[in-house]
């Protein structure tokens, strides 16, 4: 029988996935595909010129000390929708912080829709998430990030923990949007404040950067009326923020908004499985 030595670092989930695409014969095709560790990328068949990429964490969730790195490079003229196989679960951390870093590059006349399903935080989870995006002057980009502070239907609640979310979006090298969210220690008490989430436990941020700002804004605003949220467009970007009592209520608003920002296209099929 082998006994682990005292002080041995517990096994951690680590992974790195990279996808690069090119335009070939009028369709988006693979240029590079790399997978390492717990990171996997699957490419379902599509019936148009676009590509759909489903990223998977085979570890089934993350806890303190785990790390996942994703990168996407959309070449000129390509179209890529990136989503996740399921909601990412962030479990209680006994030590350390789980990290997820995503880097996206969108070339000339290309579009990337970053559409991961919700991240579910459990009590005493610790997560630092980063999103870095570089856009060509003529590129389009849509990002959606939704978070659940526990699953209300399961009786779960996040009382304490750490969640940091950092976005940096650049166009032609110039910063056009930055996010810096931090929920720490007394998460439940912080979320209860009216200036934060007003007691809601499900929330989402959506960002669109591209030439259809005004058209999309006119479609989105009626969809968020009557909910806890809002939509604004300025400086070449459209930002939507939503909050709801639970994940189901959030999806009822979120999915129509995503579709509106995709010119009527539905969310990826894996969202409905």
Swiss-Prot record:
<dbReference type="GO" id="GO:0005737">
    <property type="term" value="C:cytoplasm"/>
</dbReference>
<comment type="similarity">
    <text>Belongs to the UreD family.</text>
</comment>
<comment type="subunit">
    <text>UreD, UreF and UreG form a complex that acts as a GTP-hydrolysis-dependent molecular chaperone, activating the urease apoprotein by helping to assemble the nickel containing metallocenter of UreC. The UreE protein probably delivers the nickel.</text>
</comment>
<keyword id="KW-0143">Chaperone</keyword>
<dbReference type="Pfam" id="PF01774">
    <property type="entry name" value="UreD"/>
</dbReference>
<dbReference type="GO" id="GO:0016151">
    <property type="term" value="F:nickel cation binding"/>
</dbReference>
<dbReference type="InterPro" id="IPR002669">
    <property type="entry name" value="UreD"/>
</dbReference>
<comment type="function">
    <text>Required for maturation of urease via the functional incorporation of the urease nickel metallocenter.</text>
</comment>
<keyword id="KW-0996">Nickel insertion</keyword>
<keyword id="KW-0963">Cytoplasm</keyword>
<protein>
    <recommendedName>
        <fullName>Urease accessory protein UreD</fullName>
    </recommendedName>
</protein>
